[in-house]
């Protein structure tokens, strides 16, 4: 029977990040394929026939994008792997940001034809702030791509991180024949495209005369020159990789499976087991026998068979055991978590135990919030909070059918608690209308879709001119008596805090100037 340290040491918890359409979800599926978690990948059959395994919300399947973070666990090569597949669309960057807080490393997927794109830069910065290992997979080598050396140089120039090509592509597009493994000093020649099944691979030495028969003399000579050029570059430094200073680069095609298995195996060997976490008391040792975790995501109605709400927890230390009594620090309540679950997108499985590095889902009766800490009874430390993004777009929302008010209130309250979409009440107006704030406008579509399909409520939505929010820290009078300028409004969040929405920065100055003693704070962490 494995010890606590052995179980934790074999955990690998990582997020996959990319710009939209770089192939992130396809690569995730192929990891599941090679890990034996699925028998056949769904990507190649098309969205209409079979949606991606990691996309569970109906709107994701219809639009072909990921709008929520999916959690998947599987076993491979002696490792227990937790993949966090994140939304690539910029409108859902907040959910991605929170997910990255739960990851120990990141896989950055880059389109070989396009290079580093805007969303890639944004997500990379979040990873870099935490100094977690970042691995680069340059995808779509089965299509015409830019020069591999140029792509590596762009990653270094645009993102400010050193790179080390672990393998090197042999051709691209229709000529993509395989990769050269620099560590093993051999060619991995791909004999047939895997698509929904595993790709065929033949290993052959660079100086083997038979290589010319496989790839031709010209490509063999070009490869030899490129390998010699790479040898004159920087050396591989595993310590630099694990501290986020050096990004190992791999080339391949997630669609055809070329290069996926070598990448997965090398990544699992190079990346770190679970990392220590910072709390307000001290750094928490992952190998401590005492359980601790934090909530990084809340999701209601993951499918129609489960009309419930799950809180996703990242275990930070020790071992979780089902039916054991734990302590919710924020509420000061003891609780017994009797139905913990691991996930494969929307599919669930009850687990009896889990370890540091694992992600579990627990039923949320309405007490959890993003960033909450769960510990053993008697331990009251808190993990560092998870910031939220300030909304940039606002709408006034009400139910079209006033008879659906109860369903409207339930939907609004549950979606507000998830945190990805900010919802505010208008003081003293009940729930006739609410103000919805989002980072990107596509989130309005998701909100409207969920209210209709999960709660049966059609919405009336109209745009509002607000651009900024400020939290009222101190108010010298009743908020109803504040002197507001045109285009400003007092709102209330679901924690009972009062805020003011503004149409522009000049409005902030007007308010503080004409309301002596009023103190406003910028958008705060959850």
Where are the language model's segments positioned?
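Structural and coupling elements of P-loop NTPases
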Residues: 1-526
